């Protein structure tokens, strides 16, 4: 969260000219960051930690109860992400996290191929990769990929 605040200060620094309104603007920015941005990112971190743990519980004990818990955790984790999209700055912007977490449209065919092959290398990319390779990796991971795996037609899937 400290990184977000530093990035916000860096980005907004150019807008200040030590004029008569700077004190008012500082108050507005501090209120916005402290009251909206940081609590939203904190909630995002906490709810995604829960989601990660619940998905791992399902992985280790695949039954319908654990699957439904994963679906519920996904819904709760998604909410702060949606809110945070109103202010994509800080590390989310600077590190390009948005397309890695929320890429759309999905490449459903590639997702199924990865699952069938067990070759998870297609999920990764590095800075030296082509734009096409990066986009291909981004289109098979993140919130929408997990949504595709957990839900069908808006309803949780069932474990067979």
Ranges and model annotations:
Residues 1-160:
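Mature extracytoplasmic or organellar-lumen-exposed domains after removal of signal/transit peptides
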């Amino acid at each position: 969260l400290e990184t977000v605040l530093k990035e916000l200060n860096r980005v907004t620094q150019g807008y200040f000219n030590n004029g008569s309104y700077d004190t008012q603007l500082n108050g507005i920015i501090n209120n916005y960051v402290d009251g909206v941005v940081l609590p939203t990112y904190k909630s995002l971190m906490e709810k995604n930690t829960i989601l990660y743990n619940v998905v791992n519980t399902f992985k280790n004990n695949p039954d319908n109860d654990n699957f439904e818990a994963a679906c519920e955790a996904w819904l709760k984790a998604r909410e702060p992400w949606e809110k945070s999209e109103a202010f994509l700055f800080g590390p989310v912007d600077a590190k390009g996290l948005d397309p890695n977490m929320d890429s759309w449209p999905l490449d459903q065919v590639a997702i199924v191929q990865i699952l069938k092959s067990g070759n998870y290398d297609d999920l990764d990319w590095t800075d030296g990769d082509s734009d096409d390779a990066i986009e291909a990796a981004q289109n098979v991971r993140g919130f929408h990929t997990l949504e595709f795996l957990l839900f069908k037609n808006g309803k949780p899937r069932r474990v067979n």
